[in-house]
Curated annotation (Swiss-Prot):
Keywords of this entry: Glycoprotein, Membrane, Transmembrane, Transmembrane helix
Ranges annotated as biased composition (Low complexity): 292-322, 633-650
One Pfam family, short name: Pkinase
Glycosylation site positions: 32, 106, 163, 279, 283, 290, 325, 347, 365, 414, 520, 541, 620, 757
Name of the protein in question: Probable inactive serine/threonine-protein kinase DDB_G0274821
Localization terms from the record: Membrane
SMART domains hit by this protein: S_TKc
Ranges where the Protein kinase domain occurs: 1-266
Membrane-spanning parts: 770-792
Any GO MF annotation of the entry: protein kinase activity
Domain of life: Eukaryota
Organism encoding this protein: Dictyostelium discoideum
Keyword Transport: no
Region span, Disordered: 116-135, 289-331, 384-408, 425-446, 627-650
């Protein structure tokens, strides 16, 4: 019988041939025409999980051997475009010779159509009509067991038997993103940490808190329990460094194979043969491992294969070159995760109704369709300037919005998504051969598309309410976020439809707001608030139909921000999203006129909400707006020598300080480590956008404007870490808000002279500064020059203060000339043009005095 013959051969191979790092699945053995059998090698090994349970932790020497075996196995899989995706002790076996081996690839992911794949694979995939993308990852079998939080009942919070896989999942996977080679390296790091220290780097008895800890918290101190006899201090240092590089939450910064193999922690006589893999990368992976095995009797590798009885197709490990970037798959790779059955990518246009989706949810077979993207934001909100927010009709009608920046920018800083496989059909009807027929067809297609999207969001709203795993919900929320952040013009029409329908049919917004209130999972709240912020930030017009939900959200955010005092990492992430989404709502409402705001939205004033943001950094003062006495007539009079006597028009533009709240924003600008820089950035951007749409809001910032402006200068001057993109964006937003304050209260620019000199101001326009920062300060300089000219009387009599200012400005302009004009090839063209204008002004100096500027 074929089965018996195959059984004998496998048993003989196991007993007599080389020992593998990977137990392979043998080829299909055909018993008869209708039945296929999956034959595996008989295993006489010992479970590594049982070994750890008995011994708790490993010595350094044993850990080195363990690491070498597991790294060889993972490297072999990655070189063949396979992500193991479920590394944990129960999936590792130890044979009688002490060799550690991976036991199964049942949950692994095969990356198809990699650039290194042969033409046959490409041709096969091109013939697959269900695959519209040439770069795909396919889940080999079901991953439902991995996504369950608890081993027995996922909804039983009292059950502390947490699914073992959760401890080893990487932060990006727990956030709902796809697996990558880097995810396997993270899992290896957790495993190595557990083996050497005896405890997990992240631990909790509650599965939800465990997930939050992995995503947001720092790992525990890695303490070696059984160091070698010598150099235990050096070993500990190397181990600390290794763990810091493996357990890096950003997968783009996580250590890769070349650096991992040669890390000092693994440098000893037992692992010298591992380095041969790096030195001979021109050979195929199989050849490398065979050569490596010849240098050591403790390890060798063999090819692995698997077969599927459902498809009768085998997974073969091709002999191929090592991928160029083995640390992560192609960012354009799509992943299709299959549960129990192989389902093609779903398209709403291919279904008659959404019942198919509902059935998938009820049967727990929801197809998870997401993409591999650059995770470097958000993973927390990445400080990358997004495209300008689309102008809404209220914004376009504002005549007072002239500034150095032509438009506002989103408060929420996000990654920009370039491509995403849509679950929604995107029909572009551009052919107009027959006007009448085509118009009718276009209308019908548009109506069908709208109906599809409506059904799609009805399905999503229903799904969000279901009781399913956190990871599944996070996957769906991440898909929606990525969908709305698409920058590809190809999808602009579909995104526009999405936003219109989200606002017109408010079921999704209502359900999201409701989930924020009732959900006990902070990580889910973070994602939902983030999603709502993007919806509001990208919407040109919020429908009045969503009034109740938006107002509820506004009040919820206002109350949460006011009472927020928790500083752990997950709460900090929540606070960031609270502030950013709150800022997006305030910015949208600030674009509406007072009548629309009060009659349609029922909001008489935004002052309460703006003060909530200000109170994040409020310094208590005995004075308050309510206690401040009304200005007396004498207080409004000016002495004959004051500048106001010569320029009443200027003074009339300055609001009365006694009407302002007693606040100080100086703590925003200082480098106090207690202030989260991301929240600082969101806050400053909110203020900046409010000053664009409603310059009258300057009154909220004016009581200590002089101190505020000097603090802005100090912050921009002192922190010149140009490698930190977050710092750069803080500088840009700070200088922009700084300019708007000066523009609305020009006389405040005179205060810059008190604690400033030309070296400080030159620093503001230094070539190393971002060009937007330079432009803002050049505009401020122009205001400063203009004010000084306005204070020159008909007899060219200038008081001492203004004379000093003139001298300062002259010196500054001379510096400007030397700084910019002589280095015009090194500066931004816009900055050069602006600086050349100021150089022309320099020629109008006469006897250290200004000539009036018309």
């Amino acid at each position: 019988m074929p089965i018996k013959e195959s059984f004998k051969r496998i048993k003989s191979d196991h007993q007599n041939q080389n020992q593998d790092q990977i137990n392979y699945v043998d080829e299909n053995v055909k018993e008869n025409l209708s039945t296929y059998y999956l034959v595996k090698r008989i295993s006489f090994e010992y479970s590594f999980k049982e070994f750890l349970n008995s011994d708790q932790y490993l010595s350094i020497d044993t850990s080195i051997i363990f690491s070498k075996n597991i790294m060889n196995a993972l490297y072999y899989l990655h070189s063949n475009n396979i992500i193991y995706a479920d590394l944990k002790p129960s999936n590792i076996l130890i044979d009688s010779k002490g060799i550690f081996k991976l036991n199964s690839i049942n949950n692994s992911i095969l990356i198809e159509n990699n650039n290194n794949n042969n033409n046959n694979n490409n041709n096969n995939n091109n013939n697959n009509n269900n695959n519209n993308n040439n770069n795909q990852q396919i889940m080999i079998t079901s991953r439902q067991q991995i996504f369950n939080l608890y081993n027995n009942n996922i909804d039983n919070d009292n059950n502390n038997n947490i699914n073992e896989s959760i401890y080893y999942l990487s932060p990006e996977v727990l956030k709902g993103y796809t697996y990558s080679f880097s995810s396997d390296i993270w899992s290896f790091g957790v495993l190595l940490f557990k083996c050497i220290t005896g405890y997990y780097p992240f631990y909790s008895n509650d599965a939800t808190k465990l997930i939050e800890s992995i995503i947001y918290d720092n790992y525990l101190d890695p303490i070696i329990r059984l160091p070698s006899d010598n150099n235990d201090l050096i070993q500990q240092q190397h181990f600390n460094d290794l763990i810091s590089k493996i357990l890096e939450k950003n997968p783009q910064k996580r250590i890769t194979w070349p650096k991992l193999f040669i890390h000092p922690f693994f440098k000893n006589q037992q692992t010298q043969q591992v380095n041969e893999i790096i030195n001979k990368s021109s050979n195929t992976t199989l050849q490398l491992l065979n050569k490596s095995s010849s240098s050591s009797s403790s390890s060798s590798s063999s090819s692995s294969s698997s077969s599927s009885s459902s498809s009768s197709s085998s997974l073969s490990f091709q002999q191929q070159q090592q991928p160029n970037n083995i640390s992560s798959p192609n960012l354009e790779n799509q992943v299709i995760r299959l549960n129990k059955v192989k389902i093609p990518p779903l398209n709403i246009s291919q279904t008659n109704s959404l019942n198919d989706f509902s059935n998938l949810i009820e049967n727990n077979n929801f197809t998870r369709l997401i993409s591999e993207f650059d995770h470097s934001i958000d993973f927390e909100a990445s400080p990358i300037i997004s495209p300008n927010r689309p102008s809404s009709p209220p914004l376009s009608s504002l005549s007072s919005c002239s500034s150095s920046s032509s438009s506002s920018v989103p408060i929420i800083f996000n990654k920009t998504i370039k491509d995403l496989q849509l679950l929604i059909n995107n029909n572009n009807n551009n052919n107009n051969n027959n006007n009448n027929n085509n118009n009718n067809n276009n209308n019908n297609n548009n109506n069908n598309n709208y109906q599809e999207i409506i059904e799609y969001f009805n399905f999503i709203s229903k799904f969000i309410k279901t009781k399913t795993t956190i990871i599944t919900k996070l996957t769906l929320l991440n898909y929606l976020i990525d969908l709305l952040l698409l920058s590809n013009n190809q999808y602009s029409s579909i995104i526009e439809k999405l936003l219109i329908i989200i606002n017109e049919h408010t079921i999704l917004i209502k359900q999201l707001v409701q989930q924020i209130k009732i959900s006990n999972d902070t990580i889910i709240k973070v994602k939902i608030i983030h999603l709502l912020g993007i919806i509001i930030g990208k919407s040109n017009n919020l429908s009045i139909n969503s009034k109740d939900s938006i107002i509820q959200l506004l009040e919820y955010l206002n109350n949460e921000i006011s009472s927020f005092n928790n500083n752990n990492n997950i709460q900090l992430s929540l606070k960031r999203k609270l502030v950013s989404t709150f800022g997006e709502i305030l910015f949208y409402f600030s674009t509406l006129d007072e009548i629309t705001l009060s009659t349609k939205w029922g909001i008489l004033s935004l002052e309460k909400y703006i003060n909530t943001l200000l109170n994040l950094f409020l310094i208590n003062d005995s004075s308050s707006p309510s206690s401040s006495p009304p200005p007396s007539s004498s207080s409004s009079s000016s002495s004959p020598s004051s500048p106001s006597s010569t320029s009443p028009s200027l003074l009339s533009s300055i609001p009365n300080p006694s009407l302002f709240p007693q606040i100080s924003l100086s703590s925003i600008i200082t480098t106090n480590k207690a202030i989260d820089k991301t929240i600082l950035l969101y806050l400053i951007k909110t203020f900046d956008n409010l000053l664009i749409t409603r310059p009258i809001y300057i009154k909220y910032f004016s009581i200590k404007s002089k101190q505020l402006l000097n603090q802005f200068l100090k912050y921009i001057k002192d922190d010149n870490n140009l490698e930190d993109e977050l710092n750069n964006n803080i500088k840009i937003s700070s200088s922009s808000a700084f300019y708007r304050i000066i523009k609305q209260q020009p006389i405040l620019s005179l205060s810059l002279i008190d604690n400033c000199n030309e070296s400080v101001m030159i620093n503001m326009i230094d070539l190393n500064q971002h060009w937007r920062v330079q432009i803002s300060f050049l505009n401020i300089l122009f205001i400063l020059i203009t004010i000084n000219n306005n204070f020159i009387d008909d007899n060219n009599n200038i008081n001492n203060i203004n004379n000093n200012n003139n001298e300062f400005i002259k010196k500054f302009l001379e510096k400007l000339y030397n700084h910019y004009i002589n280095q015009k090839n090194q500066i931004n063209p816009i900055v050069f043009k602006k600086s050349f204008i100021f150089y022309s002004i320099l020629k109008d100096f006469n006897n250290n005095n200004f000539i009036k500027i018309n």
